[in-house]
């Protein structure tokens, strides 16, 4: 009986300490997309006399985030954001001496959930690493017409999953919230899009080339978390219990 009591207390003590430490904070974020050669960001397509290349050359993401601190070193984070990938593409026909360059945007929405681990660097400075998954949503296809051609990006799925990893540092002020700087890697499990680039000859006969885009990207993350006073929340809970 005594052994069972000790085991029960050992299980309840960590749970109670977790419950006391839970703090939820809300934040906003802006994430410029960084072109990176090693992320399969460029695709080359070709057929007889027609060549094309599509390359991720930037973009940005923005949205809101919610962080739930379970302990002083562990937290969960989720949110909702929009991502605009900007691609540049070229279309060439060597027999017609034709060359064209243009840009096209591909818009998506993301619902991530990650687990974070914090390492204290100073009195108010922390480093964190995060790993998790994201549900990615694509509302429509994208296209861009040029003088003698067209690029059309077909969404392969309206929703799919991806893996995300994050590394950053943050500074927690006394009453002015938390300022965060970091980087995020996002890679869908499946190809983002099937892309058709078409050259139209003098008789408007189409000469298409086709490929797929991985959709992987890297961002520089700028975030701000609004101030949340844990002591104030505890006082509110205590007051409710008394009432």
Outline where the language-model segments fall.
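Short glycine/proline- and aromatic-enriched beta-strand/turn motifs that initiate or cap beta-hairpins
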Residues: 19-65, 223-233, 243
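Sec-dependent N-terminal signal peptides
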Residues: 4-14
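Gram-negative (and chloroplast) outer-membrane scaffold detector with strong preference
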Residues: 30, 34-36, 67-144, 173-175, ...
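Hydrophobic, lipid-facing positions within transmembrane beta-strands of outer-membrane proteins
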Residues: 26, 58-64, 109-113, 127, ...
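Extracellular/periplasm-exposed beta-strand and loop segments of Gram-negative cell-envelope proteins
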Residues: 36-57, 84-108, 136-160, 191-200, ...
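Residue-level detector of alpha-helical transmembrane segments in integral membrane proteins
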Residues: 7-9, 28, 105
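Positively charged n-region of N-terminal signal peptides that target proteins for export
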Residues: 1-4, 20
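Predominantly the C-terminal beta-signal and adjacent terminal strand-loop region
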Residues: 158-160, 165-243
């Amino acid at each position: 009986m005594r052994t069972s009591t000790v085991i029960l207390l050992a299980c309840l003590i960590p749970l109670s300490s977790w419950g006391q430490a839970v703090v939820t904070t809300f934040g906003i974020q802006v994430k410029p997309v960084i072109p990176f050669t090693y992320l399969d960001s460029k695709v080359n397509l070709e057929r007889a006399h027609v060549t094309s290349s599509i390359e991720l050359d930037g973009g940005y993401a923005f949205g809101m985030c919610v962080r739930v601190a379970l302990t002083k070193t562990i937290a969960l984070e989720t949110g909702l954001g929009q991502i605009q990938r900007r691609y540049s593409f070229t279309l060439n026909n060597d027999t017609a001496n034709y060359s064209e360059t243009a840009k096209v945007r591909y818009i998506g929405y993301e619902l991530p959930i990650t687990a974070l681990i914090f390492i204290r660097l100073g009195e108010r400075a922390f480093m964190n690493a995060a790993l998790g998954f994201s549900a990615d949503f694509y509302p429509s296809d994208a296209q861009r017409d040029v003088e003698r051609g067209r690029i059309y990006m077909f969404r392969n799925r309206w929703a799919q999953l991806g893996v995300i990893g994050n590394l950053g540092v943050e500074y927690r002020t006394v009453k002015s919230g938390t300022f965060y700087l970091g980087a995020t890697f996002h890679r869908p499990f499946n190809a983002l899009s099937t892309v058709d680039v078409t050259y139209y000859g003098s008789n408007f006969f189409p000469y298409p080339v086709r490929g797929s885009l991985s959709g992987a990207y890297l961002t520089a993350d700028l975030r701000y978390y609004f101030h949340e006073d844990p002591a104030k929340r505890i006082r509110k809970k205590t007051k409710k219990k008394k009432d």
